[in-house]
Curated annotation (Swiss-Prot):
Its EC number is 2.7.7.18, 2.7.7.1. Its cofactor is Mg(2+). Divalent metal cations. Mg(2+) confers the highest activity. The gene is NMNAT3. It comes from Homo sapiens (Human). It is an enzyme of class 2 (transferase). This is Nicotinamide/nicotinic acid mononucleotide adenylyltransferase 3. The lineage of its organism: Eukaryota, Metazoa, Chordata, Craniata, Vertebrata. Keywords: ATP-binding, Magnesium, Mitochondrion, NAD, Nucleotide-binding, Nucleotidyltransferase, Pyridine nucleotide biosynthesis, Transferase. GO terms for molecular function: ATP binding; nicotinamide-nucleotide adenylyltransferase activity; nicotinate-nucleotide adenylyltransferase activity. Expressed in lung and spleen with lower levels in placenta and kidney. NAD(+) binds at S14, F15, W90, T93, G135, D137, L147, W148, R167, N198. Pathway: Cofactor biosynthesis; NAD(+) biosynthesis; NAD(+) from nicotinamide D-ribonucleotide: step 1/1; Cofactor biosynthesis; NAD(+) biosynthesis; deamido-NAD(+) from nicotinate D-ribonucleotide: step 1/1.
Length: 252
């Protein structure tokens, strides 16, 4: 049996709050990579953005990290990493990728088999490939003037790679065709299709909560309880960041 390439998926974003759509992205991406026969996804990482991101209605990072941890209680392969949220200032996506790549070089995680319980090999694990996981809406932002640095896009798709999950109203193949950098490295961009259209947005969740509407079955129950216990996303609870930074590479 040919050895598969181990992969770690990293998603950067606000996770304000984390939703079932965020979690589904990981599952869809993992299935897609496994079905290629080339890759074995061994870990997923959720990296909530720093408080200085400056986005309206952004809950404090310790709340967003806590909610992500609660949402991931039932996952045996995805974890939340607070490093980005704990930095002194907002971090560009490529810098977050560099940090986690450096960690993987120092201490690669154990590679598990398709049943998520048994190691594929008894030999020392190869250093996994780190790929940025995003929705097609983020891929579209690569075209937005002055939002991404070309050098950063180049590094992301050349050194790391992308796994892009499709969304309604977006044409990821078209976005790639329109970008010289993306076209050059399209072999390192994986387009995963979500068979069940899932358009849950954190923006909608916040609006619904602010209006006292139910969000059950849209976000995990444990997250709903946390939001209620801490009075988040209600009228008058808005937390604003300290600066207005670029929205580069971030998911709501």
């Amino acid at each position: 049996m040919k050895s598969r390439i181990p992969v770690v998926l990293l998603a950067c974003g606000s996770f304000n709050p984390i939703t079932n759509m965020h979690l589904r992205m990981f599952e869809v991406a993992r299935d897609h990579l496994h079905q290629t026969g080339m890759y074995q996804v061994i870990q997923g990482i959720i990296s909530p953005v720093n408080d200085t991101y400056g986005k309206k209605d952004l809950a404090a990072s310790h709340h967003r990290v806590a909610m992500a941890r609660l949402a991931l209680q039932t996952s045996d392969w995805i974890r939340v990493d607070p490093w980005e949220s704990e930095q002194a200032q907002w971090m560009e996506t490529v810098k977050v990728l560099r940090h986690h790549h450096s960690k993987l070089l120092r201490s690669p995680p154990q590679m598990e088999g398709p049943d998520h319980g048994k190691a594929l090999f008894s030999t020392p694990a190869a250093v996994p490939e780190l790929k940025l996981l995003c929705g097609a809406d983020v891929l579209k932002t690569f075209q937005t003037p002055n939002l991404w640095k070309d050098a950063h896009i180049q590094e992301i798709v050349e050194k790391f790679g992308l796994v892009c999950v499709g969304r309604v109203g977006h044409d990821p193949k078209g976005y790639i065709a329109e970008s010289p950098i993306l076209r050059m490295h399209q072999h390192n961009i994986h387009l995963a299709k979500e068979p069940v259209q899932n358009e849950i947005s954190a923006t909608y969740i916040r609006r619904a909560l602010g209006q006292g509407q139910s969000v059950k079955y849209l976000i995990p129950d444990a997250v709903i309880t946390y939001i209620k216990d801490h009075g988040l996303y209600t009228k008058g609870s808005t937390w604003k960041g300290k600066s207005t930074q670029s929205t580069e590479g971030k998911t709501s």
